[in-house]
A protein has these predicted regions:
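N-terminal secretory signal peptides that target proteins for export/translocation
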Residues: 1-2
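Sec-dependent N-terminal signal peptides
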Residues: 5-14
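C-terminal segment of classical bacterial N-terminal signal peptides
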Residues: 14-21
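Surface-exposed edge beta-strand/loop patches
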Residues: 22, 35-36, 90-94, 122-181
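Low-complexity, acidic Ser/Thr/Pro/Gly-rich terminal tails and inter-domain linkers that flank the onset
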Residues: 26-62
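N-terminal post-signal-peptidase region of extra-cytosolic proteins
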Residues: 50-57, 68, 127-132
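The feature marks short-to-medium sequence segments in extracytoplasmic or secretory-pathway proteins
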Residues: 61, 74-140
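Short, solvent-exposed loop/turn segments enriched in Ser/Thr/Gly
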Residues: 63-68, 142
Length: 181
């Protein structure tokens, strides 16, 4: 009799665990607030912030919104892959304004460890260009600033930034997160 009770309890526990898993799946986006640190692996730390940074020469039809991904990888450094596109369906980093996805219009990469190669140029994203992604290697601190053209009718709606990044070195790990701005 006792064996049957233990067996039933074990089956019940496994059924409950399968129906209500406790752990987050690897590709489920983590929800964070602006300013919170997101960790990828043991060496890469990312903080997302709104910014008043200007993107000179880039015209927007709606409201300009700049979001900065501040990164720190320490002396060991990191190699990171991300995919940006002016088409929100193809971009792995985009702004959610209400129910609308807004793709970035331009990007500035600022990584002091690049030395003279750190030109901080504004790269305008072309909707016709469907290039794969960007791989960058850096040490210590750096940032990626993104300009979004938010339609005027969405200027008062809550904003969230959806981000999918892959750290290639020193270990291979992908992370998705959504930041409430």
């Amino acid at each position: 009799m006792m064996r049957k009770v233990v067996l039933l309890a074990a089956i019940f526990a496994m059924t409950i665990n399968a129906a209500f898993p406790q752990s987050r799946s690897a590709d489920e986006a983590k929800q964070v607030r602006a300013g919170e640190v997101v960790r990828i692996g043991d060496t890469l730390f990312i903080r997302v912030m709104k910014s008043a940074q200007a993107f000179a020469g880039i015209k927007v039809k709606g409201e300009a919104m700049v979001v900065v991904l501040e990164m720190e990888a320490g002396k060991q450094g990191a190699t990171l892959f991300y995919k940006l596109n002016a088409n929100p369906a193809s971009s792995e980093i985009y702004l959610l304004s209400g129910a609308r996805k807004v793709a970035p219009r331009a990007v500035i990469e600022d990584f002091p460890s690049w030395g003279k190669d750190n030109d901080k140029d504004i790269d305008s994203l072309d909707p016709k260009e469907t290039v794969g992604g960007t791989t960058l290697t850096f040490q210590q601190k750096g940032s990626i600033a993104l300009l979004f053209d938010v339609p005027l009718e969405d200027s008062k709606t809550p904003k969230k930034l959806s981000v999918a990044l892959r750290m290639v070195q020193p270990m291979d790990e992908q992370r998705s997160f959504v930041v409430s701005l």
